[in-house]
Every structure is written in structure tokens, then in C-alpha cells.
Amino acid sequence: VDAFFEAVGEIPGRPVVTLAPEIPGGLDLVSAFVRRGFLVSLGHTEADVATLDAALARGARHMTHFGNAMKPLHHRDAGPVGWGLLRDGATVDVIADLHHLSPEMLALVRRCKGPEGFVLISDAAPCAGLADGDYSVWGETLTVSAGAVRNASGGLAGSVALLDDCVERL
């Protein structure tokens, strides 16, 4: 961790880092980044509720791309999605393109988190705003179709929605 901070030096403003707290040393990383003034955001995570609570206790205060690249909500295991909806001490960011989150999930986020508990983002990919078709981006072919952008394996690869589109869909 110290080598990272030596390499990047001083970062102006309030930098943000996203990490999965369940990785080996993840909770120590949360503490290290918080001590250096970072906003620690939890994302791409399969963490259980106890690990997420431990990350919150160490200063993590946000969740990246809420509901995506994380273990889904289950009736026997709230996981990161249930945790994010219930914890007042953590905000979440949502991609309101209706592909990353359904209209019902967006309504659930709004109801559980309130207007101060979530941040609207677009996750716009370089092909945002372009017509349906295939585009070469980041060394791979991305396909824009029906308002979604997907990689060759069919996974979402960012969004074609711009922020004003997301505002309208919220």
C-alpha cells in the first residue's frame, strides 16, 4: 500500500477508489485509503454483510455501480445489494439506463435511500449516443443495440445513455 502512495504522490481534491473489501487485505486497504483522505467506494464485490459492515466501520461510505458486478439480493442473504439499500451510512451510485438496473430496482433505491442517499451516474461508454452497430473500443468490439452496449461475451460494457437520458428515466 505504501508503495502505491509513493508512486502516485499527492492527489488533489478528494480522490475516490473502488475496491472489494473481501479480497485479502481489503479491510486494511479501506483503512489506508481513508487515512489518506480518499472516499472509499465498495464495488465488484461478493462480500457478506459482516465484511461490508466492517468496511463501513473503517470508513467506506459509498457503493460503485450499485447492483452491478456484485452478488445479487437473495431472500436468505441480503449481500451487497440488500446491505446498500439498508445502510444509512453508505450512499450508492446508480446507472439509470434501464439496462444496468430495472425500473423497479431504481424505484426501490429511491424509496430506501431517499434523494440524499444515491448518486445518479451514466457510465457512458465511448460509443454513447451512437446508432446501433459494432464499434471498436478499448481493443475489442462493442455492440450497441436497443439502447445497450455489450462486449463479445454479451456482458454490459458501460452505457450508451448520457446523464440527461438517465435523469429522464429516473
Language model features by range: what are they?
Residues 29, 33, 42, 51-170:
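Active-site-adjacent C-terminal substructures of enzyme catalytic domains
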Residues 21, 46, 96-97:
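Conserved residues at beta->alpha junctions
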